């Protein structure tokens, strides 16, 4: 891939952008109904369901709206009212979009729950939220049914499959249902109760308003290289619908997680473009075949997914014909090796982005694959989190809430007001029933993310790790991400996680847990080779003094490595050795 016209448009993009958030807004209206109610857009594809062994299913915006109207009537008959929490325990499928739309247009609150959750995780969330109803399928129905006795607020379960739930709902047989009157929600009204992934402790329910979806759009459009629209297009007027894009989106990110919901599903529908749904397990084969079959143009892939694809298909163009225009990645640092692979082999410059459940999509890149001549975009620096997206005032701050000098590590934080002094709509409303935790998230008007970074002279942020992931070894400050990225550059390493191992003399040793690539076996010789590899690229104090090979790293349901689990394991082992 060659760089064509590389200009830095970051400063003027931030200066020119102004938020226009309506007083009243509902996600269901913005993402579905406005497309379904017009004859020239009603039959546009909204959801394409991929099947590995059968033809794909296609559903239009009109079909989503008709089914959602019917489901809203059913939910109302079960006593669901505005403000109630409704649990949705579904994978990527057409009915998930129907369920979300139905709940939102009633003014109720969607509580997405992953099917990967075990009984304890589900019970905690159902009890903590006091959800009044659960929407399930044949996979999740039985476990939710068993929990109803311990979750008295849950009145019933509605099943999206014929053999699930207390009552079944067929989303495809609802074409004659009476229209549902859209609730008059304010943009600041609650829309989603989504629980944090729990990398640092018990999950907290973050209450997200409808307007947060609008707040995500600048980051989405930038990280997806303008999502198929012309950078020189004119601003929309009034109720005019966006047009001109032929984008097709797919991401393996679960739609029950902020990343899958706000970074893929909802923005795609908001712009009237289809998203591919796939509820099976991820694999490199699946990813390439799916993207080729459905001519996917835009995607959000975790670094772990990109690493797997790079290892499985070093030269994918020899086997697949892809139409990729943009790749966004988040969750962990991409690293130099994956960044270079995507440029050289996929023809796309990865746009890394950063955010969290509470303030999503606030920092990232907009590389435009090297063509920034039309006043849009800026260069992506390999390994950098990127810069603040338009509409967001981001800084690295110290413990007192003061901005850190260039190159000095601090907490990545988002200000309540953008650079023009306008309120930023991306903020969460607070943690569910936890006012103290909500208040502790802020220092003045700065919302702390708990992620450490440095900022360079050009405004690029460089990730240093979670505040609780960074540790000291022999007096040196160790950030695990840089060491992990270095390890993954070695052909034998599929994935890696670095944690402290307690040591009486040094305080901690640097320890790496390594998942080997196919064709490699654990050995003392390989340990020495990996240590030499890191020593040759990083500082001498950063190389892992100990390496343990494991089959898989502990991961959250959202694809993030749970270093905390490994760190606690090391602490437990050390305690047993202490006399």
Model feature map: region roles:
Residues 270, 296-301, 312-379, 393:
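Gly/Ser/Thr-rich phosphate-binding loop
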């Amino acid at each position: 891939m060659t760089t064509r016209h590389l200009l830095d448009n970051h400063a003027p993009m931030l200066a020119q952008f102004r938020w226009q958030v309506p007083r009243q807004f509902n996600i269901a209206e913005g993402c579905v109904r406005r497309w379904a109610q017009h004859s020239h857009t009603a039959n546009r594809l909204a959801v394409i369901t991929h099947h590995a062994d059968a033809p794909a299913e296609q559903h239009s915006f009109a079909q989503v709206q008709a089914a959602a109207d019917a489901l809203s009537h059913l939910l109302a008959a079960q006593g669901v009212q505005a403000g109630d929490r409704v649990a949705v325990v579904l994978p990527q499928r057409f009915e998930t979009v129907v369920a979300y739309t139905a709940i939102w247009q009633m003014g109720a609150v969607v509580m997405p729950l992953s099917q990967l959750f075990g009984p304890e995780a589900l019970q905690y969330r159902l009890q903590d939220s006091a959800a009044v109803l659960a929407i399930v399928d044949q996979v999740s129905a039985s476990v939710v049914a068993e929990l109803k006795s311990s979750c008295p607020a849950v009145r019933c379960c509605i099943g999206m499959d014929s053999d699930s739930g207390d009552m079944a709902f067929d989303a495809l047989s609802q074409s004659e249902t009476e229209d549902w009157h859209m609730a008059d929600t304010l943009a600041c009204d609650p829309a989603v109760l989504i629980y944090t992934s729990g990398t640092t402790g018990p999950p907290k329910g973050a209450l997200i308003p409808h307007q947060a979806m609008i707040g995500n759009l600048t980051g989405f459009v930038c990280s997806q290289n303008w999502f198929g629209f012309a950078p020189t297009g004119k601003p929309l007027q009034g109720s005019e619908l966006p047009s001109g894009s032929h984008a097709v989106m797919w991401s393996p990110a679960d739609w029950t997680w902020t990343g899958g919901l706000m970074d893929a599903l909802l923005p795609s529908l908001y712009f009237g473009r289809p998203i591919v749904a796939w509820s099976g397990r991820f694999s490199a084969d699946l990813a390439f075949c799916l993207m080729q079959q459905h001519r996917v143009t835009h995607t959000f892939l975790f670094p772990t997914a990109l690493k797997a694809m790079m290892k499985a298909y070093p030269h994918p163009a020899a086997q697949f014909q892809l139409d990729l225009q943009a790749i966004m990645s988040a969750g962990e640092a991409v690293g130099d090796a994956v960044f270079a692979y995507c440029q050289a082999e996929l023809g796309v410059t990865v746009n890394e982005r950063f955010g969290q459940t509470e303030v999503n999509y606030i920092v990232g890149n907009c590389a435009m694959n090297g063509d920034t001549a039309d006043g849009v975009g800026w260069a992506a620096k390999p390994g950098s989190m990127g810069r603040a997206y338009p509409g967001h005032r981001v800084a690295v701050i110290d413990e007192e809430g003061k901005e850190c000098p260039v190159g000095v590590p601090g907490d990545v934080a988002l200000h309540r007001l953008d650079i023009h002094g306008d309120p930023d709509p991306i903020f969460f409303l607070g943690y569910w029933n936890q006012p103290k935790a909500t208040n502790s998230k802020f220092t003045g008007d700065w919302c702390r993310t708990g992620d450490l970074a440095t900022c360079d002279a050009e405004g690029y942020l460089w990730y240093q790790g979670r505040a609780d992931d960074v540790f000291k070894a022999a007096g040196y400050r160790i950030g695990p991400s840089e060491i992990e990225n270095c390890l993954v550059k070695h052909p034998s390493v599929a994935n890696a996680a670095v944690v402290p191992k307690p040591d009486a003399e040094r305080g901690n040793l640097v320890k790496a847990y390594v998942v080997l690539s196919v064709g490699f076996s654990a050995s003392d010789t390989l340990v020495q080779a990996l240590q030499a590899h890191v020593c040759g690229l990083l500082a001498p104090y950063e190389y892992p003094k100990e390496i343990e090979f494991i089959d898989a790293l502990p991961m959250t349901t959202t694809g993030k490595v749970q270093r905390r689990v490994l760190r606690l394991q090391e602490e437990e082992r050390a305690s047993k050795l202490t006399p």
